[in-house]
Amino acid sequence: MFEAFSVSLFRRVAADLRRANRPSPRWRPAGFTLIVLAIVGVVAAYAIPAYQDYLARSRVGEGLALASSARLAVADNAASGASLDGGYSPPAATRNVESVAIDGETGQITVAFTTRVAAAGTNTLVLVPSAPDKADAPTARVALKKGAMQAGAIAWECFAAGKDASSLPAPGAGPLPGTAATLPAKYAPAECRA
């Protein structure tokens, strides 16, 4: 009996020693994973809004491309002294552009974007044409007028919200839009910003 007890005791002591000699559990990367998630969260906080602005700017480019036929119509009509919106058929609305309209009196082109680009009420860009006051020695830029023949080449200036002065070079600043543009400057091309 003593022998059985000693063998049993020996086995228990041996098992306890084996447990004591086991290596301790390794360090787990749980804290490192939290740090990585925090870094990804911070990067995403900056990247996602920047990407959304990039998408809106690319959609504005579509509107400016659609306005090129309107610019051509205004230039043709200004050269002949006709109504500045004569013969122009606006393009069909797209997913990004609601309308492209010409003001028949001044030739200003208003591009209205859908809510995919900017919120309703803050989604128009205005293109303003101007011409030199005299063909031979211009001293200023003047707005186009319905029925008046224009002297010299037409210059176009783009206006977004916040731009309240012309940035055309000499012979002088061009006219301002009759209807203020409402598209936020962050979505507009550089030449449309203040």
Predicted features, each with a name:
Residues R28-V43, A78-T94:
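Generic structural signal for short, solvent-exposed loop/turn connectors between secondary structure elements
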Residues P23-E62, L66, A70:
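N-terminal single-pass transmembrane signal-anchor helix
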Residues F2-E3, A79-A194:
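Periplasmic/extracellular, small/polar-rich flexible segments of pilin-like filament-forming proteins
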Residues F2-V13, V42-Y51, L127-S130:
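Long hydrophobic alpha-helices with heptad-repeat/coiled-coil character
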Residues N21-P23, W27, A47, L127, ...:
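Selective for proline/serine-rich intrinsically disordered segments
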Residues M1-F32, V36:
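N-terminal leader/signal peptides at the extreme start of proteins
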Residues G63-L84:
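N-terminal alpha-helical signal peptides/signal-anchor transmembrane segments
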